[in-house]
């Protein structure tokens, strides 16, 4: 009997960078993704449940953005906030290679074209 990987709730916060020496808890993401036992994105499970894979983005001074997590060309992972446009899409760099566990870091190119590092603060089954 095989068990299917559950969807996990992954919390990210802006890591330290110029202008944010302590990072920024208010600049954050919440990802909902299936993970393997070793903490990598389970791409085969994703293909079975793409509608469950969501993203919430919080930035100071903005409304919370709700979107979908999509698998793009070349295996890239994209955050899509509007079906009508690709100008709001964001790219997670090498997310397929990342291990999602607290204390690790991931990079996201946001809709303004700037890339930021985000610290993984929690990972738990949803």
Language-model segments: residues:
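Short, compact, well-ordered microdomains
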Residues: 80-126
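Broad, structure-driven detector of short, well-ordered beta-strand segments within folded domains
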Residues: 29-33, 66-71, 118
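Short amphipathic beta-strand and strand-loop transition segments with alternating hydrophobic
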Residues: 1, 68-69, 123
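Exposed regions on extracellular, virion, or secretory-pathway luminal proteins
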Residues: 38-42, 46, 53-60, 95-102, ...
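A short, compositionally biased
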Residues: 6-8, 72-75, 100-104
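N-terminal intrinsically disordered, low-complexity, charge/repeat-rich segments that act as generic
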Residues: 1-46, 57
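Short beta-strand/loop turn elements enriched in aromatics
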Residues: 50-91
């Amino acid at each position: 009997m095989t068990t299917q990987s559950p969807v996990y709730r992954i919390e990210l916060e802006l890591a330290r960078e110029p202008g944010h020496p302590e990072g920024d808890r208010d600049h954050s993401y919440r990802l909902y993704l299936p993970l393997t036992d070793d903490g990598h994105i389970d791409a085969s499970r994703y293909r079975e449940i793409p509608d469950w894979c969501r993203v919430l983005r919080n930035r100071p001074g903005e409304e919370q953005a709700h979107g979908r997590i999509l698998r793009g060309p070349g295996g890239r992972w994209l955050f899509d906030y509007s079906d009508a446009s690709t100008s709001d899409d964001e790219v997670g760099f090498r997310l397929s290679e990342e291990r999602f566990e607290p204390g690790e870091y991931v990079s996201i190119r946001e809709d303004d074209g700037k890339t930021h590092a985000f610290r993984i603060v929690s990972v738990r089954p949803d």
